Amino acid sequence: MSNGTVTAAIVGSGNISTDLLYKLLRSQAIEPRWMIGIDPESEGLKRARGLGLETSHEGVDWLLAQSELPDMIFEATSAYVHRAAAPRYAEAGIRAVDLTPAAVGPAVVPPVNLGANLDAPNVNMITCGGQATIPIVAAVSRVVPVPYAEIVASVSSVSAGPGTRANIDEFTKTTSRGVETIGGAQRGKAIIILNPAEPPMIMRDTIFCAIPEDADTDAIADSIHRMVADIQQYVPGYRLLNEPQFDEPSVVSGGLAKVSVFVEVEGAGDFLPPYAGNLDIMTAAATKVGEVIAGQITSARV
């Protein structure tokens, strides 16, 4: 290991972990060395072994018993597993990037609040729906007050593995909270739809924000376009489906004006096909966060 490289372990060997592995292997700042799972037959562990990583199906206990520990951990297991392991990572001095909805540490959306949370020993990537929609809410709320925001994330059923399905309740709670605390809405709501359509549908998200009746719609639209460009820096397949739509106050919208934004996320196809943009935006955001933290770790060594 050179002084310029930060070592990492991936905890979890499912869809998200395997997609993340391919992104970390391309990183100039992070060296993925370990992948840890609990199923010796998992496809993720097989692929990681084939790519030269050290693997184990004996979980976090095995990793923390090694003579050399990673500088960073990326965990994509489930919320309850990460909650149990997080104090052990902290005790060992290992920085953690949490891709579960456990929310042990502060939630991070790279183009919105990454800089404010760089010193946290454990950062949370919220959810795929959160990464795709919270930046849009933030883009609106930096222009006008947003008393209410609602997001609907629709993802292909085949892209949702057992970990995602086990986390559905946490998904809605964590994403709703992120819409408020990071997106800036006074009240937030999140809905996820697992779409069983064949052939599989690309990830699509709808964002509704209540806005003042006299809001500057041009300024809001410009802010949304700037935020989309920021996201595209690390998720090239993120795009608006059409221009933001503005509606006058109505009974349906609770007497408030609203803006509706429709986006889709096409994945890079690193592990799963491009329709699995819900995985891609999580792993791309986690890689972005990890590289910034790795820069911190490297600077501290000098």
Swiss-Prot record:
Oxidoreductase: is it a keyword of this entry? yes
A Gene Ontology annotation in the biological process aspect, one of them, is: catabolic process
Q: Does the keyword NAD apply?
A: yes
Report which reactions are catalysed by this protein. Answer: acetaldehyde + NAD(+) + CoA = acetyl-CoA + NADH + H(+)
Q: What is its EC number?
A: 1.2.1.10
Q: Which family does it belong to?
A: Belongs to the acetaldehyde dehydrogenase family.
What HAMAP family does its record include? Ac_ald_DH_ac
Tell me the protein's name: Acetaldehyde dehydrogenase 1
